[in-house]
């Protein structure tokens, strides 16, 4: 299974649409958003994902997602949010995945070393990072799709069969 991992879109319409186009072209099976969509109107851009992908579109909220109720009502029509909105535990492609916008590094390391999850996904720092622990656990921050802080607009694609990931730059 191929999973696109996006974070920190911050309402950047052009980059969201460009990422959606790449995701559709590459026949990605699922999308996970690690938070900071920002406004509920982003739904109209993510709505351009292929129907088969929208069935596997999951996300958590970030610290800049102030309109959580509206995001859940609007974007929630195509994106599945966890009950608390902040942390998601899901199984996709036979892999157990933990998603949170801004866990502390110590928490990421504890989760990785516990081997309770195969993949740990985060956002918030806007810095892209792929780390593979000795036990095979992947910890990924896809960077920022918006490109506002680093000047790099990025997201990640995970191949769950190979248990590897690469960063896509727009």
Question: Where would I find each of the regions flagged by the language model?
Answer:
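Core catalytic region of metal-dependent phosphoesterases/phosphodiesterases
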Residues: 2-91
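Hydrophobic/aromatic beta-strand patches that form the interior of the parallel beta-sheet core
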Residues: 32, 58-60, 119-121, 138-140, ...
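Active-site-proximal beta-strand elements of phosphoester/diester hydrolases
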Residues: 2-10, 94-102, 138-143, 167
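Metal-centered catalytic cores of metalloenzymes
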Residues: 41, 59-62, 110, 160, ...
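Active-site environment of divalent metal-dependent phosphoester hydrolases
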Residues: 10-14, 38-41, 64-70, 104-109, ...
């Amino acid at each position: 299974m191929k999973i696109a991992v996006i974070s920190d879109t911050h309402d950047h319409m052009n980059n969201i649409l460009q990422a959606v186009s790449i995701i559709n072209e590459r026949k990605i099976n699922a999308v996970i958003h690690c938070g900071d969509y920002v406004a509920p109107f982003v739904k109209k851009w993510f709505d351009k994902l292929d129907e088969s992908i929208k069935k596997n579109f999951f996300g958590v909220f970030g610290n800049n997602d102030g309109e959580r109720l509206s995001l859940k009502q609007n974007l929630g029509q195509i994106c599945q949010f966890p009950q608390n909105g902040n942390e998601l535990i899901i199984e996709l492609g036979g892999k157990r995945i933990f998603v949170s916008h801004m866990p502390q590094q110590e928490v990421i390391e504890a989760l990785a070393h516990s081997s309770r999850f195969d993949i740990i996904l985060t956002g918030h720092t806007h810095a892209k990072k792929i780390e593979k622990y000795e036990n095979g656990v992947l910890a990924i921050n896809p960077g920022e799709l918006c490109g506002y802080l680093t000047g790099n607009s990025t997201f990640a694609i995970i191949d769950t069969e190979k248990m590897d990931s690469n960063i896509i730059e727009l």
